[in-house]
Amino acid sequence: MYLNSRITRIFRLKKERFWQQNFLYPLLLQEYLYSLAHYHSFNSLIFYEPVEIIGYDNKSSLVLVKRLITQMYQQKSFISSVNDSNQNGFSLHKNSFSYHFYSQMVSEGFGVILEISFSSRLVSSLEEKRIPKSQNLRSIHSIFPFLEDKLSHLNYVSDLLIPYPIHLGILVQILQCWIKDVSSSHLLRLIFHEYHNLNRDIPSKKSIYVLSKERRRFFWFLHNFYVYGCEYIFLYRRKQSSYLRSISSGVFLERTHFYGKIGYLRVVSCYSFQRILWFLKDIFIHYVRYQGKAILASKGTFFLMNKWKFHFVNFWQSYFHFWFQPYRIHIKQLPNYSFSFLGYFSSVLKNPLVVRNQMLENSFLINTLTNKLDTIAPVIFLIGSLSKAQFCTVLGHPISKPIWTNLSDSDILDRFCRICRNLSRYHSGSSKKHILYRIKYILRFTCARTLARKHKSTVRMFMLRLGSVFLEESFLEDEQSLSLIFLHNIPFLLHRLHRERIGYLDIIRMNDLMDHS
């Protein structure tokens, strides 16, 4: 409650306070920001590893934060204080856990400050322009009805990976358009320097390895900021170099330094950029992105999609100063191509429909073809993810999870059921349900092998003693609830439940196992 009240007071500051100061650098020394960053960062650690493996709890973490704040108040450099900070009873060696913990806490606190500043500027800009705020926490499954409605009428699709900048200094230059405070810029470069050293020389200790695998809040913010800069091409094209008069594009106004980019592009690309714009007019073009993967679809010709591809390449090379290979952007014809997006293999299938028509004494058949979007869960990627997480072999054979044998039976069963439930819910939009049944089979027998190993027994003896119902009731909880819903509303569709694609409206992120693939 104390942290929430303090953060609420920050958000209630007047707008003039945010604009008068160059940046919120004095807030960097406040403890509650680091505590908030600790709460968001370490409580969302990888779901199948115990928190005790890192070697700290909430009390000790607050002690580390306070020691860090004390050193910063004493105006000691973060790097120079590594060798002479043993006065508090612990070492800050460069390969120690405390050193990397300090580095992460600095970056997380700095990321919280960035979010507060940029979100306040964005909200104030939307209120001044009377633009309604959009809901950011929209379910991922809501994208598939959009794709099903749009892609079935389009001809070509291009899937691309938004390139990541080669050097972190590019991200510093992007943020310096907004951050005018010199101290904050130096601290930003220091964080990048520490991150580079951490990736170059990661110790073999398991605690630091788990800490380094955590996706930091600060770098997620930088990645999103960079992606919005890459999407600047769409804003520039919608109004043909007009200065953002459309409401739909106004939401990106405060995320990118728009006017500076326009002037810079005119100098770099001269007048070739203006000559291409009239050729790229296409009202049937659609763009969908999740994280670094984007889909660009159009009803135009292959020549138009090829122009868009080279336009992307030229834009990234001229603005972000790095070379991007054009062959990494694939252009395929939709009826003959399947693309990977959001953990699914999606393709447009031709669905034949035969209708018999009779006029007077003559009857004839009308054969029509309709396009339908088909989504399939990638079984090879899922098994590969389970194999990397040590739930099965590469071929999909269940194995025991020895790291969980020190837990109680209820905790082991709860973890397996939670993983199975998350995978089943996320991939419920797959048209082939036997893939989900295979994943459930692997997790079910992995759970049985783990419990049998804990009790020093075989799987057969364990199942005979407790019965197969012991695992079936837990792993079939979602299917039973769905059966009750469909039975109550439309009972005649119950026999088709195993073929129906079901979407959930509360999924705002991909499951953790899909990140391994």
Curated annotation (Swiss-Prot):
Transmembrane segments: none annotated. It comes from the Eukaryota. Keywords: Chloroplast, mRNA processing, Plastid, RNA-binding, tRNA processing. Pfam families: Intron_maturas2, MatK_N. GO terms for cellular component: chloroplast. Belongs to the intron maturase 2 family. MatK subfamily. This is Maturase K. It comes from Phalaenopsis japonica.
